[in-house]
């Protein structure tokens, strides 16, 4: 293995101002962890502080040995107080998830909904209410395996619930993949479309929606 977890190293977040891209990076120590994928990061201002809020799928550790690694990241939030030079962090949920995505039009600004991939399901978080709902695939004994869900808005001015989530889903019955389309306004309902693909796509397959 090219790299391995070490308890001798810590973890930190770096903040570079967007209005000063050649300026210094401010570093903030956080509890040891590993992050592959970020949901979103937004700037917030209160009466007495300038804040940066980062939300991501967090592993408590990874690559400690050469064996197989579990799918055990959980959604986490870090609030960086730039004024006081401190960081607070909290766990958002206990579900094991990965590949968090929001409506791409809202990257860097507050988004209400974030969708993640769990085992045999998609999990959508309502970041305003602090709740979550699931869309399952397949059966309990042979669940389908979804990949990262991408939001396709119904039109350029559509809200976060006016559009569809697109996910490649592995079908273990036929050993192939489908492109599954879910109505964002009925997340737990049946898919509105399912397109069989001529071959299986690997798990973790990334994608983006580009309007034609």
List the predicted regions and their residue ranges.
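Beta-propeller domains
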Residues: 1-212
């Amino acid at each position: 293995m090219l790299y391995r977890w070490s308890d001798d190293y810590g973890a930190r977040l770096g903040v570079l101002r967007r209005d000063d891209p050649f300026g210094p990076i401010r570093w903030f120590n956080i509890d040891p962890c590993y992050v592959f994928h970020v949901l979103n990061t937004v700037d917030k201002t209160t009466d007495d502080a300038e804040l940066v809020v980062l939300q991501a799928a967090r592993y408590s550790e990874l690559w400690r040995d050469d064996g197989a690694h579990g799918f055990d990241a959980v959604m986490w939030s870090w609030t960086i107080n730039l004024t006081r030079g401190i960081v607070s962090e909290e766990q958002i949920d206990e579900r094991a998830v990965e590949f968090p995505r929001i409506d791409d039009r809202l990257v860097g600004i507050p988004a209400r909904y974030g969708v993640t991939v769990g085992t045999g399901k998609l999990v959508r978080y309502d970041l305003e209410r602090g709740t979550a709902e699931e869309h399952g695939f397949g059966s309990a004994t042979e669940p389908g395996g979804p990949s990262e869900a991408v939001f396709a808005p119904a039109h350029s001015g559509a809200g976060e619930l006016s559009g569809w989530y697109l996910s490649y889903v592995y079908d273990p019955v036929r050993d192939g993949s489908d492109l599954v389309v879910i109505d964002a306004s009925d997340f737990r309902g049946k898919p509105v479309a399912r397109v069989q693909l001529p071959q299986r796509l690997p798990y973790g397959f990334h994608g983006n929606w580009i309007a034609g």
